[in-house]
Curated annotation (Swiss-Prot):
F(1)F(0) ATP synthase produces ATP from ADP in the presence of a proton or sodium gradient. F-type ATPases consist of two structural domains, F(1) containing the extramembraneous catalytic core and F(0) containing the membrane proton channel, linked together by a central stalk and a peripheral stalk. During catalysis, ATP synthesis in the catalytic domain of F(1) is coupled via a rotary mechanism of the central stalk subunits to proton translocation. This protein is part of the stalk that links CF(0) to CF(1). It either transmits conformational changes from CF(0) to CF(1) or is implicated in proton conduction. The lineage of its organism: Bacteria, Bacillati, Bacillota, Bacilli, Lactobacillales. This is ATP synthase subunit delta. It holds the Pfam family OSCP. F-type ATPases have 2 components, F(1) - the catalytic core - and F(0) - the membrane proton channel. F(1) has five subunits: alpha(3), beta(3), gamma(1), delta(1), epsilon(1). F(0) has three main subunits: a(1), b(2) and c(10-14). The alpha and beta chains form an alternating ring which encloses part of the gamma chain. F(1) is attached to F(0) by a central stalk formed by the gamma and epsilon chains, while a peripheral stalk is formed by the delta and b chains. InterPro entries: ATP_synth_OSCP/delta_N_sf, ATPase_OSCP/dsu. NCBIfam families: ATP_synt_delta (TIGR01145), PRK05758.2-1 (NF004401).
Length: 178
């Protein structure tokens, strides 16, 4: 992706978030974006929208199906994407919208990797640790299970990481023995 395309994607995302923020609709916008992104992840919609083999009329039909029960701002955004023929960048634009919402609201997704699934109590403790250590509000809690950690956990928020895994501690111990 070129710098020009990246700047375009970020500008579309930033503009949509600004409009929603002015109208106090960030939560609604975030829900709309997450629902559409889920559609992208469960289908090959991104490939269809970015393919030159798919006619523009088909892309219009696909995006019309996405409109559904979205907010006015999201539907207007999708119409704008269609008018400017930027369908190929929609997935990246929606990702940019989520990033911009996180920046504006200081609410970031939290990824927790542990050797075993977390209990509800542990999840609430993770949210408290994130709020205290990272000074951000925890958004979605994305849980991953990796038995190779042996024990402990890895918390990742906004490109910052806390790694208390036994695996890392063993690696550090091994390096100290050398």
């Amino acid at each position: 992706m070129t710098k020009k395309e990246q700047a375009l994607i970020e500008q579309y995302g930033k503009s949509l978030v600004e409009v929603a923020s002015e109208h106090h609709s960030l939560d609604t916008l975030q829900a709309d974006v997450l629902a559409i992104l889920e559609t992208f992840e469960t289908t090959n919609l991104d490939q269809s929208l970015s393919s030159l083999a798919v006619p523009h009329a088909e892309k219009i039909k696909l995006l019309t199906l996405l409109k559904g029960n979205n907010s006015v701002y999201m539907n207007n955004f999708l119409n704008l994407i269609l008018q400017n023929e930027r369908e190929a960048y929609l997935y990246q634009m929606l990702q940019a919208v989520l990033n911009e919402i996180a920046i504006v609201s200081n609410q970031y997704d939290v990824t927790v990797t542990s050797s075993l699934p977390l209990t509800e109590e542990q999840k609430s403790r993770v949210r408290a640790v994130v709020a205290k250590k990272f000074a951000v509000t925890a958004g979605r809690l994305i849980e991953k299970v990796d038995p190779s950690l042996i024990g402990g956990f890895i918390i990742s928020v906004n490109n910052k990481v806390i790694d208390t895994s036994i695996r890392r501690q063993l690696q550090a111990f091994k390096m100290n023995l050398k």
